[in-house]
Amino acid sequence: LKDDASATTSLYNEIKLQDSLLFTAFNTRDLETYKNYFSEDLEFFHDKGGLTGYDVTINFLKATAQQKSDLKRELVNGSLEVYPIPGYGAMEIGSHLFTHIENGKLEYGTFKFLHIWQKKDSQWKITRVVSYDH
């Protein structure tokens, strides 16, 4: 059990770091870094927007940057769960807070997400996203 707990803790820390790096790129509009976190066969399921893929996901950040939006994402403390997917990678589940200024007022929303991460050649990429509870 100790080895499993240690491996699980290590995986948790690894995915938490990947999440942090991904959304630092999102928050700073670092498109080149951001797009490297997604597999080109990405499937993104959204409870309001339906199913989209890699191009829509990348173009969203590109448009956000072009519009000079101040949209920011922050992981909700204590919400992160990470589970191994043997032979593939990991499942990340949590809640995140998005904020931006609209008409001079701070707008915010907390939503739930599930990311499926695949580890290939020591690199983590998200292959599936489920974004819900909007």
Predicted regions and their residues:
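Exposed beta-sheet edge and beta->alpha loop/turn motif
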Residues: 88-121
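Short, conserved clusters of charged catalytic residues that mark active-site
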Residues: 10, 17-18, 74-77, 112
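Residue-level detection of beta-strand scaffold positions
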Residues: 22, 29, 33, 58, ...
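A generic structural motif
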Residues: 45, 99-101, 132
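Short, low-complexity N-terminal intrinsically disordered segments enriched in polar/charged residues
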Residues: 1-40
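Residue-level signal for well-ordered, solvent-exposed loop/turn and beta-edge residues enriched
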Residues: 50, 105, 123-125
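Short beta-strand edge/turn micro-motifs at domain boundaries
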Residues: 1, 110-134
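A solvent-exposed, acidic/Ser-Thr-rich amphipathic alpha-helical stretch
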Residues: 14, 31-88, 95-97, 107
